[in-house]
């Protein structure tokens, strides 16, 4: 993406990890960054054209998929992922100046963040009430506006500077190596291939029967396409047991083998939603993809040569 779009909506308010990840993208820094209260608000703004692109969290290395983002992209919006961004996450406990740990009986944050710090909170603040917010920065803002010295927020360190809070405990996540993946989404356009890309699709099964998932996976295995992520989510229709499969595959739709796999899936399964081909944040095994593509082209040429010999 050579030129930054005019307006990018992101999960706000100011001070979220989402904003931190967004401003870390050099080619997007000159765009107008507009905070929204919820992920749905961001995606609504993209769908309506109020902003050009949206930037939202979609996966955490400790807690897994951010389901409300994933489900919204699968079921509620027709948007395309333009890129992904992965950043390291350090969660801190933020308080109003003068607050002591023993005084805290109310903790604000979003569910994904408090879940990542469950062990710390259980050991140090076992009786504190957990109050749900839409973002970690919103939690910090709420604490900054409180009048007592009994509230705290699980939030980024930079939110302390934004909202005038103190860091009473740092790096409180239960596991090391905490990272979050964010995606940039838009209404149209598939980015050009970079040689290190991912393709996201959703497959709705034509029939729930033995071997149905295996048949889907074989389309990728037969072409030596690596699936970096496979998720099953309820389709939200037809009661229990109705699931779709969200798949993230290494490669770009411009790759012959990826395109061929999607073509076969569409023909055999019928209901396949394309969610984008875009630059991957993590380097994958490119040599395997290049060799597989070369073998596919050679095989295609061989079949074409044989077919050219058919009597007219």
PLM regions and their residue ranges:
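Domain-level signature for soluble enzymes in the chorismate/prephenate branch of the shikimate pathway
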Residues: 1-312
């Amino acid at each position: 993406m050579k030129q930054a779009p005019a307006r990018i909506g992101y999960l706000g308010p100011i001070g979220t990890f989402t904003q931190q990840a967004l401003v870390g993208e050099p080619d997007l820094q000159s765009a107008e960054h507009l905070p929204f209260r919820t992920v749905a608000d961001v995606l609504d703004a993209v769908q309506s054209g109020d902003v050009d692109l949206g930037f939202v969290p979609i996966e955490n290395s400790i807690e897994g998929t951010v389901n409300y983002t994933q489900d919204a992209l699968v079921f509620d919006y027709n948007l395309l992922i333009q890129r992904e961004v992965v950043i390291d996450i350090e969660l801190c406990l933020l308080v109003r100046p003068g607050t002591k740990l023993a005084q805290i009986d109310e903790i604000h944050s979003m569910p994904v963040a408090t879940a990542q710090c469950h062990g710390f909170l259980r050991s140090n603040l076992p009786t504190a009430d957990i109050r749900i917010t839409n973002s970690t920065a919103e939690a910090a803002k709420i604490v900054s506006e409180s009048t007592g010295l009994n509230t705290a927020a699980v939030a980024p360190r930079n939110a302390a500077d934004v909202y005038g809070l103190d860091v009473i405990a740092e790096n409180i996540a239960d596991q090391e190596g905490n990272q979050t993946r964010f995606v940039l989404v838009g209404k149209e356009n598939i980015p050009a291939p970079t040689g290190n890309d991912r393709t996201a699709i959703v497959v709705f099964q034509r029939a729930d029967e033995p071997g149905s998932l295996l048949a889907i996976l074989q389309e990728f295995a037969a072409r030596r396409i690596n699936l970096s992520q496979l998720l099953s989510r309820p389709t939200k229709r037809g009661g229990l047991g109705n699931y779709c499969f969200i798949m993230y595959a290494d490669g770009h739709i411009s790759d012959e083998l990826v395109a061929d796999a999607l073509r076969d899936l569409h023909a055999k399964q019928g209901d396949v939603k394309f969610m984008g081909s875009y630059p991957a944040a993590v380097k994958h095994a490119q040599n395997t993809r290049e060799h597989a593509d070369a073998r596919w082209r050679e095989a295609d040429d061989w079949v074409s040569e044989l077919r050219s010999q058919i009597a007219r």
